[in-house]
Amino acid sequence: KTYTVQWNLNDSAPAGHPASNPNTAASYTVLDADITVSPATRPGYTFLGWYDNPGLTGTPVTTLRTMDAENKSYYAKWDTTPITYPITYVLNDSTPAGHPATNPAANLMSYTVLTNGGGNINVVPALRNGYTFGGWYDNPSFSGSPINSFSAMDAAPKTFYAKWSSANSYTVTYTLNDGTPAGHPATNPN
């Protein structure tokens, strides 16, 4: 005989914070091996376990015992304490020395998924005298596109790297005065 398995993620409130369930078993038979129950994930929440009752009481279930020979319903329990994730800004201003960069106060140093409601968090350009800001990147090699904002639903620590180019670029042109005497052209030693 086949028995059903129902997974209740308990993720309807607040809206916009859907959970993900790695458990795919929708049914089992008594002849099946016991099934190890995996934790669910939900951005901004800590998973506290699967319970066999909607009141979320007792001990969390870690194994679906197939010898029980009955339909099963499991309920996810979440810690709703907001989780705060750090944001690190690497200013890349050590060379040349004497040109420190500043990170505007408008840039958040951390974010909380539940507080920020899943919206976008903007990243403000840094400032450095004599340099043009080329953007914040999520990698030190500056590959990909610059980051102007990110989703609070990313629910992970962030590190952004500042890219700079010199704002004071000059072109030097040498004009050689080699018109006379004839046959003796001037040369540029540079």
Language-model-derived ranges and their functions:
Residues 1-190:
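Secondary-structure capping and domain/repeat boundary segments
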